[in-house]
Amino acid sequence: MNRRSIALLGSLLLAPVARATPDAAESRETRATMGEIFRAVAELLPPSLDAKRFADPAHHDAILAALTKLSTGGAKLEAHGRERDAGFGFLSRSLARDTEEIRRRYAEGQTEEARFLFHEVTQDCVACHSRLPSPRDASLGRRLMLEEQVAALPLDERARLEIATRQFERAETTFEALLASPEYRASDLDLDGALDEYLEVCLRVRRDFERPARALERFAARADVSPRLRARVQHWILSLREIAARKRAATPLAEAQELLAVAQDRTRFPDERDALVYDLAASGELHRFADATPAGPEAALAYFRLGEIESRVGRSFWLSQTEAYFETAIRMAPGEPFAPQALARLQEFLVSGYTGSGGRQVPADVQTRLAELRGLVERARPAAPPPPTPARQVQPPAAR
């Protein structure tokens, strides 16, 4: 089974929305939509775990009907996301696009492609649920975790399922078992992102610094940890304890700026990956600030900083939020000093995604969007003052 089990997707949508919106009715509608999506996924889960059953014509009509419900629910969630913070909006748009793509491919007979995409779309879920603190775990998720099929998942898949179902304390415990397991090589855990995901849960969601420091000390003591990885983990352990001991700034945005100043200090962190803990801690503060501040120059600055961080720490080939953060910063405040920087970073990010074309193969719709954003920034730029009028020179009278 794919490392991102389909069960992740089904459970993601059990969770309440990350922040209560001002309109309680809208919040209820969002939860109802998530329930619709979950029920569709519950129908799809059993056949999706068996490639032959998923492709069996005897099950075609039932699977297509469930995929249609899933796609419809994704479209509804996208509509709700327009009224939410930019991060939720981006992820709900991504979910809507992906679920419709799955339905279309299955309807066209591309059953294995649809099944693969169904597995991969879980990144929408994990990305959304690991942004903000959670006051409690979700009861529906707890019940799902008791399923025999779920309990038998490998540790890495189970940990990601627990994130998607908002079982964050369980996810911490499962990740710690994963980091200690001799069945997984230390280098693979690093390359596969398990260390990063564990720290995301601890810092962004649980806001816990000492527990991961102890877990990383145990991981660093493993015999198969390379000297370079051990040195990196030691950087992370020191950073965790420094942040836990420091005096917080007055606001989340100010706190994030201070943490980022350390993360970007290349005299201390010549390799930017060594600064992961400071980056993740700063991103947690920025998410909290953006969640509470839906608009304005400071919110735009928060999204610009999130784009910078995501460009350094993002791992997903399937779902990169870098583009969404930079674009949100530009649209929200095109006249701010950081907007041209956001535009330059966005252009670099998008063009590099289409190499080795050297940018010549950037799709027309992407070029159109970049041109629109460039126009926003240029129109918002203060007009240059006119050059001073030269003083009129008085000619001396002609000599007689």
Q: How would you name each of these model-derived features?
A:
Residues D61-A107, E112-H119:
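Extended surface/linker regions that mediate inter-domain or inter-protein docking
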Residues E26-T33, P47, G87-L91, D98, ...:
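Acidic, polar-rich low-complexity tracts and alpha-helical solenoid repeat scaffolds
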